[in-house]
Amino acid sequence: MRLRGLCAAATLALFCVAPAAPSPQARAQDTPDPALENAQYWLGARGPDELELSLVRASEAHVGQSVSVTLRLDNTSESAVDNLQVTARRGDAVDTTTQARQQLAAGAYQYYGPSVSAGSLEPGESREVTLEVPTALGDESTLAITDPGAYPLLFTLTGTRDGEAASFAEERVLIDVLGDPAQHEPAADSDSEAEERHQFSLIYPVTAQLDVVPGDTGGQDLILESENLAGQFAPGGRLDQLVETYLSHDLHGSGCMAVDPALLDVADRMAAGYTVNPSRPSIAQRPKRLRDSWFSASEQDRGDPGTGSADAAAWLDKMRTVDCTMLLPWANANTDAVAEANNAWLTHEALERGADTVSRILGTTVNSELTAPASGTTAHEFSVPLVVADNSTWVGNATTFDSSLGALLAESGSMPQTVGYSNPELRYDFAEDSEQARALTAGASISVAAAQEDQKDMVAKLPNYLDPAAARSVMETTQRLLDAGQLDPRPVTALPIKSAQEGPDGEPGSPYPDPAAFREAEIAQVAQQARYTDELMSIMVNEPSIALTRYGFTLPLRRDLLIALSDTTRTSLRGNAQAARASRERLQKNSDALRDLRSSVSLIPPGNVYTRVSESSPLLIVAENGLPLPVDAHLAYDAPDGATLSTQDSVHIPAKGSITVSMTADLPSDMDRTSLRLWLATPTESDGPAGHLISEPIDITVQTRAGIVSVYGVGIVAALALALAALFRLGRRKKKKSHG
């Protein structure tokens, strides 16, 4: 039961037009993989529906008034269904967000309301029905709602298939039922009421999937795989709506936008111009001969100019007007996975680069030092304080948010997230309920949390991958409660930062299994590539005449690794498999790019056999560098016992150039030929370990003086033999002539 579009959500007064029904192919792509790893941690309650029942729109709900609800029916099966009927039911009002989650997962819904007939549907057919749901006690088929509050509603779709009765689908939603609009509700101004109000703060994340083509290096133009981001930056696009929604609501200073610095960086580069292409040309290509370039199609393979530069620039202008900013990890990377990769530069880019990026692009400083990871938990200590769930344990410094409210808010949007800090018994495929229903639920959950009596402070953290419909619903409800004095605004900058808190077993992190956690093999691959990137950087040398630095050149390669560790769609049941696949593909392409860059620094063998005129004759070999910066490398070798090479401590190869390296050799005199293997390695300290291999090893054979003498001796003997044979034949001919 899904709605394929995003509709405005203002409390429950949401009116939008349903988009066309999705194609069977689209449904197939969104369907969870039945063989999903750790399926028991994703699906704890509610099974899949046979058909789809999706909330399209609903009128604002008030006590004693009817609610008009429009739903769409989609027959996604391969057979016809008949005698369809949609019925409305409700459960008791919920007092806590935990109760709300329990009702949505496995509620009783014991109060029955009206039904409406929906006829028959052939395979692939869709239909909309409108249901008037009375709430007054005296009405017929009423849900009998007499008090304001948050109520769980259930819409069921039943009918027959091949003459057999069946239940085909359900749609569950939490709605905010307001009081009678004719009765004025004064704001809570008394001292006693003020003491009962929650201090409220809201964290509003903004991020997106970044499809920068892997293998990017410093100094290169931006290449994107698609125009997906351009569409989100355009007026009415997802990112444009998110910023507009934040700016158009007054949260009385209680809200703060948690922005992904990687998104800002890509938007800034898009504004300067970019290209759309599924691949990128190698920057380490060796020069080609003219005739080799005649039939090259490389110029035709460079892609098309991007069309979203102006929209990206306009979006950044809006971002510069945001009143409060804080940070997400770079590319919304999983902070625990970054820590387990155990690379200092990678951790720096994930958590410490963001503030400088905001300052450089937006011209402002971040208002809060807090960073909000998508996981909502941390098992590692970082240099910056994190925002974590209040039911988790952590090391380092952190502030906490309401975990139950956070789990309920995370269920909203086109990519509903299964967060690791949520109770597995209350998990299910949240996308079984439509986006519109979950947007309404998100808004109502703020009202529920605001009315809870068991807590005084309230921090609402929206999901890191936020959609406009849910954002509008939450912001409308929040502003209504703040305007009415039912919440006390507290700036995010005023949130208390707490020191390490360990759990009963001493293990920090999530209290429950996280189904989206990165596997050890994935982290090991990232760690390996991060190390290779460090090694590549270590051989390059900054050149005063070249603006590009070695760190700047390798920086995009590290950022590729952070994109591969992104939680943006990985934490969603229906996005996990595709996210894991995209991560593997990015790591493979990044590995290919690293291999290409490393192989551009190479040794060129002098031929199969290198002949020395004398023992003091030097060996000459050419070292080539295809990188845009000079390279300092160590010439390493492997030789048989008794053979040694005297090489330079460091070989300096100019940028995009080559150099001839001279070395002397002390080779065994009793051997005709000596085989040597040479390669370039990372620089080493005098007493340090051997450097890591950079170039592919080459094999050369050195012919010694003894070998030369041996060859000459064989040649002389052969020449004498030929001369004697010729003299012998000549003598025989003379004898024959004399006898003739």
Describe the residue ranges of each PLM region.
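Short glycine/proline/serine/threonine-rich loop/turn segments at secondary-structure transition edges
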Residues: 137-153, 669-677
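Active-site beta->alpha N-cap acidic-glycine motif
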Residues: 171-173, 177-318
